[in-house]
C-alpha cells in the first residue's frame, strides 16, 4: 500500500514538473513595460477606432452627396475592415499583452491571424480599388460611368474580400505553414511547418505588389493632372477671349464654373485617398519588415516589434481623422451625424444674410427655369462634353 502511494506521489510530482516546463518555456521575451504600453495602446485604439469607424459608416450611408461617388463603396469597405479589426482583433490583443499569454484556446488562436492578416489585405486592396477608380476617372473618363455601375462595384468589392482571405488558405489548411501560437511572443500568427512559412510570399503578393500598383497609378494620375491643368488654362483663356467678343457667354461661364467645381472636388478626394495610403504605408511597413526580416531573431529588438505593432494598430484609427481633416463633404456628413446624435446643435444652417430675401426670389425663378426638361437635356449634354477637359 505504501509502495502504491509512493508511486502515485511520484507520478503526480512528475506531472507537476511537466506542467511547469511549458510555463518556463513561454516566458515573455518582452519587458513588462513594453507589454503594458502595448496593452494600454490597444485599449485606447479600441475605444477611438470603434466609435470613429461606426460614425464614419453612419455618415457615409446617410450622405447622398458622398454616396454619388463610386469611391465611397471602397471607403465603406475600408471602414468595415477597420471596424472589424478594432472590435475583434484589438480587444484580444489588449488582453494577451496584459496577461502576457494567450488564454483564449486553440480554435480562437487559429481564427485570430486569419482576421488580422485578412483585414490588412482588405484594407490594401480597397485602396487599390480606390486608386484604380481615380485613375479611370482621369485616363478613361468617357468609359467611367460604364465601368462603375452599381453591379460592377459590388463585384469588385466581392473580389477584394474573397482574394484577401483566399490568400490565407495554404496556412489555414496546413499546406504551407500553419496558424498557431508563438509561445515566445504569446502571439497567434502564421508559423513554420516543416521548415516552411508563407509569410514572405504573402508580403510580396498581399502587401508589396498592391503598394507598387498604387504608387504607379498615382504617379500616372499626377502626370495626367499636369497635362489637364495645361488644357484647363488654355480653355480658360479661350473662354475669356470669347466672352470679350460675345454677350452670350453666360451658359459657357456657368458650365466652366460647374466643371471647375467638380474638378476641384475630385482633386480633394484624390488627395485624401493619397493621404490615406501614405499613412497606411507608414503605419504598416515597419511591422511587415519586422515580421519578414527579423522573424527568427525578434528577441534582439523587443521594443522595436512592440512599437511596430502599435503603429500598425493605429492605421485602423486614423482614417476617420483624415476624412474629417481633408474633405469638406465628409466634415459636413460628420456634423450631421453628431447633430442627429445630439452631441451638439445643428451647425450647418447659417443665419440669412442681409440680401437673403432679395436673392431668394431670383433663385426661385432660376430654379423654375432649371427644372424644365429642355434645360436638363441641354445642360447634361453640354456639361458632359466640357467636363472631360476638367476631370482632374
Swiss-Prot record:
Superkingdom of the organism of origin: Eukaryota
Any one GO molecular function term: G protein-coupled receptor activity
One Pfam family, short name: 7tm_1
KW Electron transport (keyword) present: no
Subcellular location as annotated: Cell membrane
Membrane topology: Multi-pass membrane protein
SUPFAM superfamilies the UniProt entry points to: Family A G protein-coupled receptor-like (SSF81321)
Residue(s) carrying Phosphothreonine: 372
Residues in the Extracellular compartment per record: 1-39, 95-110, 178-202, 290-302
Effect of residue 348 to M: In strain: Shanghai and Tananarive
Topological region Cytoplasmic: 61-73, 132-156, 224-268, 324-392
Glycan attachment sites: 298
GO biological process: ectopic germ cell programmed cell death; G protein-coupled receptor signaling pathway; germ cell development; germ cell migration
One annotated Gene Ontology cellular component of this protein: cell cortex
Modified residues annotated as Phosphoserine in this record: 359, 362, 366
Summary of the function given for this chain in its UniProt record: Essential for the first active step of germ cell migration: transepithelial migration of germ cells through the posterior midgut (PMG) epithelium.
Identification of the protein by name: Protein trapped in endoderm-1
